[in-house]
Amino acid sequence: KVNKGQLNQFRKILHKKNNIGIKITYKEQLSPRGLPDAFLLGEKFIEKDNVALILGDNFFYGQSLTAQLKQCVKLKSGARVFLHPVKNPSLYGVANINKKNKISRIIEKPKKTSSNLAITGLYFFDNKVVDYSKKLKPSQRHELEIADLLNKYRSNNRLKAEFIGRGGTWLDTGNIEDFYSASNYVSS
């Protein structure tokens, strides 16, 4: 899924750089309808497959990450969400974890929270994600919210947390300052 007006830019860049033999299919989101809308747009592409959603403004790094991703690709049912501790949880969707290391609550950009575990932009879902997304109601922002989708999986005891392993990190590069910080991290 790409935002309105960006489709040709992505085609131009990715077509030139696609030397690894993969086929890329694009769907343009014509208006802001939220992250779960990507699954509705891609319903025919997804069919009976499981899917991953990776937000383009996120940077992930870590030696153990490859092994974790390979395990998540083998997902048979349910959903996996990657969590990472942050200093300012009110800027992110946050997950509360209980004593059994299960997600007990998901809150979108809480003013106060007992957790510092941000929900990163890396998700794995079984093929029920399309059906679950169809049942979501738009939020006050008139968008389908990823937190609501995750809560649907959680309420059915089908959501598991993944933690970026030791030596790994996640950086949100959604604004210019964060992008600059990620650039400095990579160059150091």
Where are these regions (language model features)?
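Conserved N-terminal catalytic core of the sugar/cofactor nucleotidyltransferase
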Residues: 1-55, 59-67, 175
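Short coil/turn connectors at secondary-structure junctions
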Residues: 20-23, 47-50, 56, 75-79, ...
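Conserved beta-strand termini and adjacent loop/short-helix elements that scaffold enzyme active sites
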Residues: 27-29, 82, 162-164
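A short acidic, often aromatic-flanked loop/helix-cap motif at beta-alpha or helix-coil junctions
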Residues: 31-35, 88-89, 112, 169-170
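Catalytic-core segments of class I nucleotidyltransferases/pyrophosphorylases
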Residues: 52, 66, 70-73, 102-188
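Short beta-strand segments
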Residues: 53-56, 82-85, 165
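Conserved donor-nucleotide/metal-binding helix-loop-beta segment in metal-dependent transferases, i.e.
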Residues: 62-90
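A structural signal for short hydrophobic beta-strand segments in well-ordered beta-sheet cores
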Residues: 95-97
